């Protein structure tokens, strides 16, 4: 066990939280979510669980922070793909959006468990910060799309949500799941790998 020194300054706390998120993200990509605990996250950091409790109280608090980081990265790339002053046909828009979606599959894997798992195990205050950021990005992109194609805000919002939910569900279903593959084999059902970008386009 390495010596643990509690962070004091805000910069130190942010650096420590970055370590925690990196460890949790690594576990998310290597083991089933239900097997991840604060103890396994602490173990990957060579900390005790008590030390981890100085920063978070549930693993979902960590994963909400990770989801937030990945969401901001997604929105940054989404807006960069559609600079002001340029025009695209619906087909061109769909292709550029599909490229961004494909580059941010990790965000959609987290989104797949956001509402049903992550959000129910965090405080309202933490979730409020996340929701504020989400709606800021969503509303801005919806306006951009509505203005570009002369859509109502409602219709543009419905398109955004349909893409988000489809991407999240598709990422969850296309992610490698050994149990699912074994179940299909037992049931005699052929397993077909899906092309995520093509499915989103």
Give the residues covered by each predicted segment:
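Hydrophobic/aromatic-rich alpha-helical bundle segments in the mid-to-C-terminal region
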Residues: 147-201
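Hydrophobic alpha-helical connector segments
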Residues: 65, 79-107, 159-163
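Amphipathic alpha-helical segments used for helix-helix packing
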Residues: 103-125, 178-183
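Alpha-helical structural segments
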Residues: 15, 19-26, 44, 61-81, ...
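Amphipathic alpha-helical packing segments from all-alpha helical-bundle domains
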Residues: 121-149
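An amphipathic alpha-helix signature
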Residues: 94, 138-142, 201
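Helix-turn-helix
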Residues: 19, 27, 33-61, 65
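N-terminal intrinsically disordered/low-complexity leader segments
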Residues: 1-15
């Amino acid at each position: 066990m390495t010596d643990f020194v509690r962070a004091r300054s805000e910069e130190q706390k942010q650096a420590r939280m970055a370590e925690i998120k990196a460890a949790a993200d690594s576990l998310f990509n290597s083991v089933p979510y239900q097997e991840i605990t604060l103890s396994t996250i602490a173990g990957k950091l060579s900390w005790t669980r008590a030390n981890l409790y100085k920063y978070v109280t549930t693993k979902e608090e960590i994963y909400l922070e990770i989801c937030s980081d990945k969401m901001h990265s997604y929105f940054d790339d989404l807006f960069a793909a559609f600079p002001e002053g340029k025009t695209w046909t619906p087909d061109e828009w769909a292709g550029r959006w599909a490229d961004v979606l494909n580059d941010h599959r990790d965000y959609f894997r987290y989104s797949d468990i956001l509402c049903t798992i992550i959000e129910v195990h965090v405080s309202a205050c933490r979730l409020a910060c996340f929701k504020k950021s989400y709606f800021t990005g969503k509303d801005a992109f919806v306006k951009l799309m509505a203005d570009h194609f002369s859509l109502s805000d409602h219709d543009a919002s419905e398109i955004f949500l349909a893409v988000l939910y489809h991407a999240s569900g598709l990422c969850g279903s296309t992610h490698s799941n050994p149990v699912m593959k074994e179940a299909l084999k037992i049931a005699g059902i052929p397993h077909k790998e899906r092309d995520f970008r093509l499915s989103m386009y």
